[in-house]
């Protein structure tokens, strides 16, 4: 008697199928109802995620979400003698029948919050692994016509740590005191997934959040670079928003002051940390937190690289030119990623030529620039690449309480076009 898959124990079938690469799962779903039911089971999802993470660790591969030219990709980067990057998938997020353009993306434990480029009336939260989405209507408070159609707000996505069902929340705010000190647009609000409501917060800031630093979420809080309300642009503090308490903490002094400062989250030995990259006309410095909570942060120096060392490495020409030009007011690096084991920083950048631009990664170690990776030609010179780490999750996105019909429509709104390993050009 010939044994078929249907005759095998469920646990054995799950173990076999969990070895299938992520980019092949979509094709398996379409094979038959039994395959689709298996792929939808929680036990299989957890096993598959665990095996994917183990495979990535064995390869020394860093998996991350990258936003380029208003599209979102899942990528894997291996930093070794044979430096390589591969595209693991592209996010297809549809509203109706149209692919939406995404201008910002925020990651929180497997969920992505995406901000739309040409539509300020809605945002979308999604779980790429499960293929679930939730579209959320925003509240509009346009004061000038120049804002029309552009989402000028800052965002953060995080879970409440004291919530039994771990429901996520969104913080949304605007404070344009820097541009309109006499009459700033000032609004802080949170969105609750359980109630489907926006709540206005009573905030009277004596500080100013520097949004270009990027907010970093960890341990139920989100952190930004900040300055005192009437201070200069040199960033010498952090400030924390506690999602559980629903408020901001005090200004937390930094061990440095810098104009061009970017934060990034990182995980090391199961401990969540924050990395801070800043530069002057002479050096690039990266610090990493050793202890962090809502009111206190301690730091250690990860490495310091002097521009003179970068200048000796021609593969870093596009990167160090920014520094020797002393463009302190315009930090080219909008986003970066740290590989703690290899002790390198992956700085996402845009290399602009006379006719075309390219999205690139400069991989920098303690001795200077290691290599430059060219990701792809860029069709938009003003859209800088953004990166955040990514770990798949089985967290279900709670849908609006408006019936099954809308839930079904929303689930059709996202798909991941998983391709076979697509190698990217390495310079």
UniProtKB/Swiss-Prot annotation:
List the protein's name. Answer: Putative F-box protein At4g10740
Every copy of the F-box domain together lies at: 2-47
SS bond partners: none
Q: SMART domains recorded for this chain? A: FBOX
| PROSITE patterns in alphabetical order | FBOX
Which InterPro entries does the annotation name? F-box-assoc_dom_typ1, F-box-assoc_interact_dom, F-box-like_dom_sf, F-box_dom, SCF_F-box_component
Q: Which Pfam families match?
A: F-box, FBA_1
């Amino acid at each position: 008697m010939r044994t078929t898959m249907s005759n095998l124990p469920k646990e054995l079938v799950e173990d076999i199928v969990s070895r299938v690469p992520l980019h092949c799962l979509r094709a398996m779903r379409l094979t038959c109802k039994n395959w689709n039911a298996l792929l939808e089971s929680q036990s299989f999802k957890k096993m598959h995620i665990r095996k994917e993470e183990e495979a990535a660790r064995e390869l020394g591969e860093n998996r991350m979400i990258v936003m380029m030219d208003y599209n979102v990709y899942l990528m894997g980067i291996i930093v070794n003698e044979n430096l390589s990057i591969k595209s693991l998938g592209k996010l297809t997020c549809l509203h109706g029948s149209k692919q939406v353009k995404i201008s910002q993306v925020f990651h929180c434990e497997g969920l992505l919050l995406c901000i739309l480029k040409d539509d300020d009336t809605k945002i979308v939260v999604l779980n790429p692994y499960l293929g679930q989405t939730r579209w959320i209507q925003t509240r509009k408070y346009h004061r000038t016509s120049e804002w029309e159609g552009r989402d000028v707000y800052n965002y953060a996505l995080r879970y409440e740590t004291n919530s039994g069902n771990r429901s996520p929340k969104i913080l949304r705010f605007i404070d344009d005191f820097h541009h309109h000190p006499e009459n700033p647009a000032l609004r802080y609000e949170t969105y609750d997934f359980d109630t489907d409501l926006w709540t206005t917060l009573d905030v009277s800031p004596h500080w100013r959040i520097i949004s270009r630093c990027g907010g970093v979420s960890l341990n139920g809080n989100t952190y930004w670079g900040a300055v005192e309300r009437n201070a200069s642009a040199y960033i010498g503090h952090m400030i924390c928003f506690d999602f559980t308490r629903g408020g901001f903490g005090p200004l937390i002094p930094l061990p440095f002051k810098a104009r061009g400062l970017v934060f990034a989250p990182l995980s090391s030995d199961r401990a969540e940390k924050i990395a801070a990259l800043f530069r002057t006309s002479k050096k690039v410095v990266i610090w990493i937190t050793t202890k962090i909570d809502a009111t206190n942060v301690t730091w250690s120096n990860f490495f310091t690289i002097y521009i003179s060392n970068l200048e000796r490495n021609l593969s870093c020409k596009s990167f160090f030119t920014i520094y020797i030009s002393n463009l302190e007011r315009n930090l080219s690096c909008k986003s970066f990623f740290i590989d703690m084991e290899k002790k390198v920083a992956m700085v996402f950048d845009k290399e602009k030529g006379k006719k075309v631009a390219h999205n690139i990664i400069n991989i920098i170690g303690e001795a200077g620039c290691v290599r430059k990776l060219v990701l792809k030609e860029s069709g938009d010179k003003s859209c800088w690449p953004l990166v955040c780490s990514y770990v798949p999750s089985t967290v279900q996105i709670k849908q609006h309480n408006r019936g099954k019909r809308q839930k079904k429509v929303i689930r059709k709104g996202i798909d991941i076009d998983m391709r076979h390993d697509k190698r990217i050009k390495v310079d």
